[in-house]
Amino acid sequence: MDAVELLMNVTPNETRIALVETGMLREVHIERQAKRGIVGNIYKGRVTRVLPGMQSAFVDIGLEKAAFLHAADIVSHTECVDENEQKQFKVKSISELVREGQDIVVQVVKEPLGTKGARLTTDITLPSRHLVFMPENSHVGVSQRIESEEERARLKALVEPFCDELGGFIIRTATEGASEEELRQDAEFLKRLWRKVLERKSKYPTKSKIYGEPALPQRILRDFIGTNLEKIRIDSKLCFGEVKEFTDEFMPELSDKLVLYSGNQPIFDVYGVENAIQTALDKRVNLKSGGYLIIEQTEAMTTIDINTGAFVGHRNLEETIFNTNIEATKAIAHELQLRNLGGIIIIDFIDMQTDEHRNRVLQSLCDALSKDRMKTNVNGFTQLGLVEMTRKRTRESLEHVLCDECPTCHGRGRVKTVETVCYEIMREIIRVYHLFSSEQFVVYASPAVSEYLINEESHGLLPEVEMFIGKRVKVKTEQFYNQEQFDVVVM
């Protein structure tokens, strides 16, 4: 297993964490304080109102608005033990379940929105990378997405010994293929966490938060239990102290791997992470052989196109295509992980003439994807020669986190040519001429469009329009207009 380092860069209101494996950036995680929610937090609340007609109750958990608890969300784990199993049971009357003035431990499942308070459940769960802990329950549930009966039985047999009076577990989809040691570390971590929640429950007053969904550094460490973490470098004394306190209490095996970075250069610059992040926002990915990938992210899917680059001649073309496709499989696996691309992914490899080459490329892709922490599924080549695959989506892609829609092209990825905009201006002048009586028109446009209209490049477009309408047209440059932006003003 390759050595892994985590680099944590902390600035006011933003934390960035890079996973570097053998010197190469593999993953980037970003959290901004303004976007942190309360889903997953556990509160010691008090029922303030019971509404039998709505089968719900309002609970004061110490926030500005009272939170909402529906009768269907007051359930026990024994009624639903599989991660994806639908709850099927008869819901009791809310009046039988809670009463006004009752203290109750609840977990937030939906953020407050507008005038509505947060939505709650009494069905407390604590997640880690492989397991979900279910307090006060001895069952072991297995995600239905793990389809192999043999694997389901293996995992269940490994996890059952970890169940005790504290609770049981749900085995998550990502657990497929996990080792006994990975599962043991996950289970021990979750039980230590629950003991802390119980301790706070008895000590803290009503309307208090007794567990908060961890900040990004703690979540990342939680999810990397069992991996070959070599060093965890942190460039903030405050964050270092918080992480050290967390690892000392819940993950003592990681405490001696923490390093406080105090260099003069930013930590992401020293390790080449900053440049790698910028490169990961480009559509084009260059391959060492001279070929390249074009990665296009859309609402429906992600498409990846592979090209050979320079033409090498007919005699070696088939071998060049095959080698380029093999190289591309490794680059694709890396880019999917780095950019955090999920959902449907369509790959257009360069056309190959033999089934042997196609099968070897497909196997190379599967081998490269096997190192991904996210679940992937490769469906093979379609009749059109495209490879269909899926990758589990758990968070926004790097592009969606860091970028916004272009205000000029509105997400098209293209802007109209200067010539096209000039003809639009001419049509607008003629339209306005028929609507209003005017002696003169003034066109305000971007520098490139203004220059095209004024100079001879436009092949006399402006004089022709002036002759057509019998009016004078002036052109003025607006430095801050984008290429498609213009105004036609009547004088």
From Swiss-Prot:
Superkingdom of the organism of origin: Bacteria
Bound cofactor: record note: Binds 1 Mg(2+) ion per subunit.
Compartment(s) of residence: Cytoplasm
EC numbers, comma separated: 3.1.26.-
Gene Ontology annotations for the cellular component aspect, listed alphabetically: cytoplasm
Top-level EC class: hydrolase
Main localization (coarse): cytoplasm
Ranges where the S1 motif domain occurs: 40-129
Pfam family, one: RNase_E_G
Listed SMART domains: S1
GO MF entry, a single one: endonuclease activity
InterPro entries in the record: NA-bd_OB-fold (IPR012340), RNA-bd_AU-1/RNase_E/G (IPR019307), RNase_E/G (IPR004659), RNase_E_G_thioredoxin-like (IPR048583), S1_domain (IPR003029)
Record-level GO BP terms: cell division; rRNA processing; tRNA processing
Keyword list, A-Z: Cell cycle, Cell division, Cytoplasm, Endonuclease, Hydrolase, Magnesium, Metal-binding, Nuclease, RNA-binding, rRNA processing, rRNA-binding, tRNA processing, tRNA-binding
Residues holding Mg(2+): D305, D348
Cofactor section: Mg(2+)
Function: An endonuclease that acts in the processing of the 5'-end of 16S rRNA and 23S rRNA. It prefers 5'-monophosphorylated substrates and cleaves single-stranded sites rich in A and U residues; contributes to tRNA processing and mRNA turnover.
Subunit and interaction comment: Homodimer, in equilibrium with possible higher multimers.
Similarity comment: family membership: Belongs to the RNase E/G family. RNase G subfamily.
Protein name, UniProt field: Ribonuclease G
Protein species of origin: Haemophilus influenzae (strain ATCC 51907 / DSM 11121 / KW20 / Rd)
Gene: rng
